[in-house]
Amino acid sequence: MGALSVRDSSGVQIVSNPATVRGDSGCVSVDSVPMLTIGGAGAEGSYDLLRASGALRLPDGGVVVMNGATSELRFFDHSGRHLRTVGRLGSGPGEFRRPGAPLWFGADTLVVYDTWTARATFVSTRGGLLKSVRIEGVAGGGELLGRLSDGSLLLAIARGVTEGTEPGVRRDPVHLVRLSTEGVVRDTIGSFRGPEVAVRIAESSTVMTGAPFSRRTFFAAAGDRVFVADNAEYRVRVYANGRLERIIEKSVEAVPITASDIEREKAQRRGSGRDPSWLAWLDRLYQRDQLPASFPAFGRIVVDAEGWLWVSAYAPSPGGGFAWDIFDASGRLRCTCQLPSGFRVREVGRDYLLGVGSDADGVEQVRLYGLRRSAQGAH
């Protein structure tokens, strides 16, 4: 696949992109120095971040951060000064047990989904608690992906460990459903392959953990479109109003998993573990003939404020950092952008990029970078 090709198959547009963009001069550029940094070594109180699961930039230039370790939604102004905190650990109204990232629900409203209680909490951008809604028919788990243009919410529901779950590596289905703002399931968009997990049966429990070099399906919502991307291959499916509209492909060469890759990941997972039965299970899990031959085709996806699709590489580039492929709204690959290694993108606006990284001491920070779009990157 050496050149861009666009074809139609039974009413579905298939956009096949080459591995690189000819004459790629960069459709976007990201500043090397952040405009705003929150957290890091020496930070105290509300500025001390741990397991920041998400962040959004507010209309007034401020930032809201979900600090997962304390189940708090923290609001900061445009200079990084802490303004207020909403929520705490608990199961009551305005409290969270296992909160996900804050998501937009309208121009002045945020929504946070608690996977432990299967409850969506709506909060104003000024920090006021608006309402909490229990999702009907959902026992827990899942991930809230965003709001669609018709006002419905998009929720991915996966099955957890249940009685009778067999040991081994598996990919159970994830069901993508649309919800009303009252927590009622309207319809199901589809069922897709979930994350690849390894199931271990211990003496008194069943444990599920990520499989080595795990394949998984990523989801994103933007306007009336839903993006579904299984990184077993470089292919992103785009649904509009519940119907498959477009498939975006890119030509990539499989990157083989080497013996050193296996040993490095195994050592990271082993850590300081000493339990003999667990170590024996880990050895079996990482046997060469039990592993895939190559890495997943990509890392994750994000849809920006212009409706463009960003797809990250699975592994860092040789010089450090991660390459992100950027596709326009028609599915055409426009350019590739390098971002710092370890920086987890949470939101891409028209002129900014917001995410979570670590400082030189390994302490979490939320960082806001300026982003410029060239003529070819402007909508």
Predicted regions and their residues:
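Eukaryotic scaffold repeat domains enriched in small/polar residues
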Residues: 1-379
